Amino acid sequence: MDNERRLVLLTGATGHVGFAVLVEALEAEYNVRVVLREISKADSILSSEPVKNALSSTAAPELSFVEVPDMTVPGAFDSAMQSVTYVVHCASPINRGKFRDFQTELIDPAVKGTTNILKAAHATPSVLRVVITSSNSAIVNHNILPAPGTCVSPSDRQPDYPLDVAMHDADEAYSAAKTSALNATDTFVSSANDLRFDVVSIMPTFVFGPKELAKSPGDIIDGSNVFGIGLVLIKQSWGSLRIEAVSCHIDDVAQAHVQALNHDEDVQFPFKAGTHRSCLLASSFRPDEVRDIVEREFPKESWQGEEAVFRGKGSYAWYHTDYDVSAAEKLLGRKLKGIVEQIRSSGLQVLRIA
C-alpha cells in the first residue's frame, strides 16, 4: 500500500510500545501527529536518536505534536483528529507504581480514552482505520486459566471484571481495564451507525526488548522487561510470585501496529468498514532460559563477578497459556521473534547504557 504520506494520530508515544510504533511509522514514511498530555514531553522524543535518524532524510515525513491533558474528558480528541487518516491508540496506564484509586488512575483512562478516540474518529470523515493496543489480559483471566489443551484465540472474549475483583490490586485493575476497553470497542463498533472505518486490536503478551527512551538499566526494567532481562538484573528474591511466562519482542509489536495500517485487499486485515479484528503476539519461555541466554550471548565479565552487570540469579514460578498467533504472523509475513532475540536485544541495551 502506498501510504501517500497520510497522517497518523498516535497516542502513548512516550511509552515502551508507543515510542517503538512512532519510530516504525516514521521509517515507513507516515506523517505522524503525536498526542501528549504535556507538550513539553516532545523534547525527549525529538532528541532521541531513532527519531532524529528517521527525520534526517531530505524526504523525511512530518512529525507534529498536540496536547491533550486528559483523554478521559468527552471530546478530548476532537480537534486532534482533524485531517487524520489512521489512528494508533497506544496510550493506557500500566500496572506499575503506587495508585490511590484504581478506578480513576487505571480503568477510566483505558476505557474512556478508547471510547473517546473512537467517537472522535467516527466524527472525522477522513479516518479509515483505528489500531488499538490491547493485551492478552483483555481475553484471559489469569485467575481462571483456560482448560488444558485450550488455545486462546484473538477473537475470544471475557466479561468485564466485577468491581470487587477489579479493585483488589493493580494487576487485577490493569486486567479489568484492558478487558473493559476491548469490550467497549466491540460495543462501539457493533452499535455505531454508518461507521466508515474499521478497527484492529493488537494484543501483546509481556513485551520484552529495548526501551529507546530509557536512560538507565532501571528504566529498561520499569515495565514488563522486569520479567525478562530483569531476572539477571534484580538480586532480591521473587518470593511467591507466579507469572505467565509468555512474551513478545518490541520490534514485532511495533511492526504489527504499523503493518495493520495497510488495508489492501491482499493483506491480513483488508479494509472492511464497521468491523473489529484482532491479533495476538505470544511466545512461551522458561525463566531459567534467561540466564542461559545471557551467559551464551554476552562477555563473561558482564555476568560473572562482583562488578558484573547481570548478577541476578533469581527466578519466579511460572505457567504457560497456548495462544493462536497465526494472524500476527500472517500480518508480519514471518514467525515471531522468540526469547533468545528478546533477551539479546534487551541485554545489548543494558550494556550500552549501564
Swiss-Prot record:
Q: What class of enzyme is it?
A: oxidoreductase
Q: Which UniProt keywords apply?
A: Oxidoreductase
Gene that specifies this protein: ALT6
Q: What does this protein do?
A: NAD-dependent epimerase/dehydratase; part of the gene cluster that mediates the biosynthesis of the host-selective toxins (HSTs) AAL-toxins, sphinganine-analog mycotoxins responsible for Alternaria stem canker on tomato by the tomato pathotype. ALT1 also selectively transfers methyl groups at the first and the third cycle of chain elongation for AAL toxin.
Q: What is its EC number?
A: 1.1.1.-
What highest taxon heads this organism's lineage?
Eukaryota
> What pathway, per the record?
Mycotoxin biosynthesis
Any GO MF annotation of the entry: oxidoreductase activity, acting on the CH-OH group of donors, NAD or NADP as acceptor
Q: What species is given as this protein's source?
A: Alternaria alternata
Q: Which Pfam families match?
A: Epimerase
Name of the protein in its database record: NAD-dependent epimerase/dehydratase ALT6
Tell me what else is known: Gene clusters encoding host-selective toxins (HSTs) are localized on conditionally dispensable chromosomes (CDCs), also called supernumerary chromosomes, where they are present in multiple copies. The CDCs are not essential for saprophytic growth but controls host-selective pathogenicity.
Give me the residues that bind NADP(+), please: K41, Y174
Provide the family line: Belongs to the NAD(P)-dependent epimerase/dehydratase family. Dihydroflavonol-4-reductase subfamily.
